[in-house]
Amino acid sequence: MITVVLIFSAYLLGSISFAVVASWLFKLPDPRSYGSRNPGATNVLRTGKKAAAAVTLLGDAGKGWVAVAAAKYGGEVWELGDEVIAGAALAVFLGHLFPIFLAFKGGKGVATSAGILLGLNPWLGVLTISTWMVVALVSRISSLSALLSALLAPLYAYFLLEKGILIMAVSIISVLLILKHRLNIANLMAGKEARIGKSS
């Protein structure tokens, strides 16, 4: 029962869209109505409101970290297996991608996945985020940074995580993130992908 509660709570937490929350707080248009129409930090940044984008980024990453941290704590208290941690990680990510509060139409999960990785292993999170930052600095393309980071995250996880089920969870999250970027991949191949801070 505790396992079900932890995983379902993680999904509900993931369903909270901080892009929508931040846009409401800063009196901005709904992020689903402009730019890439993606409720994420990069799209919110297109409004020019860096503070709103920061709130979105920290909120989306924070919920990923909290879900994993709660599962770890619950696992210790109730002596649950690593399956609960993996389940919570996947649930919070799926909540962000398919939020019940937004008719199951959510974001692409970049910030949330970063929070999840930090929760699983700080070095895993730091390595993946560093990969994103380096690619972003060179290319100024958020989606390319996310895609390369997603490709490398399972490799980092293989060396940093001891449990196979956690490595599997990271791999599934990476695959889902890449699938969510299908349109971005097409735009990248066509040379039409927007750069960070620019209109889509």
Curated annotation (Swiss-Prot):
Reactions this protein catalyses: an acyl phosphate + sn-glycerol 3-phosphate = a 1-acyl-sn-glycero-3-phosphate + phosphate
This protein's record includes keyword Lipid biosynthesis: yes
UniProt signal peptide: none
GO cellular component terms listed in the entry, alphabetical order: plasma membrane
Functional pathway: Lipid metabolism; phospholipid metabolism
GO molecular function terms attached to this record: acyl-phosphate glycerol-3-phosphate acyltransferase activity
GO biological process: phospholipid biosynthetic process
Membrane topology note: Multi-pass membrane protein
Residue ranges of the TM segments: 1-21, 84-104, 116-136, 159-179
EC number: 2.3.1.275
Subcellular location per the Swiss-Prot or TrEMBL entry: Cell inner membrane
Assembly: Probably interacts with PlsX.
Name by which UniProt lists this protein: Glycerol-3-phosphate acyltransferase
Organism of provenance: Nitrosomonas europaea (strain ATCC 19718 / CIP 103999 / KCTC 2705 / NBRC 14298)
Lineage: Bacteria, Pseudomonadati, Pseudomonadota, Betaproteobacteria, Nitrosomonadales
